[in-house]
């Protein structure tokens, strides 16, 4: 039930944390950006361990599709660049793949 929202939380926490490093190293922001950035990366790691999956690799694989979509949303909302049609098509393919991994029937 909480799988998709938890993946979304993890994605935005990871992106936010990584963006703090990007801002510091590429946008000449203060090193103080790293403090919330590292906290955000800690939240990301914690959230990803809350995923209801039997294997870490499966949780990470499904997360990849959600992460790609979240990255494009971040690019649009935070960086002001709208995804183009190829971004959108690529993200859709990845999200479909993630949904197959998350909701696909498993043999016991």
Curated annotation (Swiss-Prot):
Compartment annotation: Cell inner membrane
Swiss-Prot/TrEMBL keywords: Cell inner membrane, Cell membrane, Membrane, Transmembrane, Transmembrane helix
Entry superkingdom: Bacteria
Transmembrane segments: 4-24, 31-51, 59-79, 85-105
InterPro entries, per the entry: UPF0060
Gene Ontology CC terms, in alphabetical order: plasma membrane
SUPFAM superfamilies (UniProt xref): Multidrug resistance efflux transporter EmrE (SSF103481)
Pfam family, any one: UPF0060
Membrane-related topology note: Multi-pass membrane protein
HAMAP family for this protein: UPF0060
Similarity comment: family membership: Belongs to the UPF0060 family.
Name used for this protein in its record: UPF0060 membrane protein amb3269
Source organism of the structure: Paramagnetospirillum magneticum (strain ATCC 700264 / AMB-1) (Magnetospirillum magneticum)
Classification lineage: Bacteria, Pseudomonadati, Pseudomonadota, Alphaproteobacteria, Rhodospirillales
């Amino acid at each position: 039930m909480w799988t998709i929202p938890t993946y979304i939380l993890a994605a935005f926490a990871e992106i936010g944390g990584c963006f703090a490093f990007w801002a510091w190293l590429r946008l000449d922001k203060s090193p103080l950006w790293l403090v919330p950035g590292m906290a955000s990366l800690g939240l990301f790691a914690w959230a990803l361990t809350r995923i209801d999956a039997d294997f870490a690799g499966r949780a990470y694989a499904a997360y990849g599709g959600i992460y790609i979509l979240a990255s494009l949303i971040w690019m649009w909302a935070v960086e002001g660049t709208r995804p183009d049609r190829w971004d959108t098509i690529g993200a859709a393919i990845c999200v479909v793949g993630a949904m197959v991994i998350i909701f696909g029937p498993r043999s016991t």
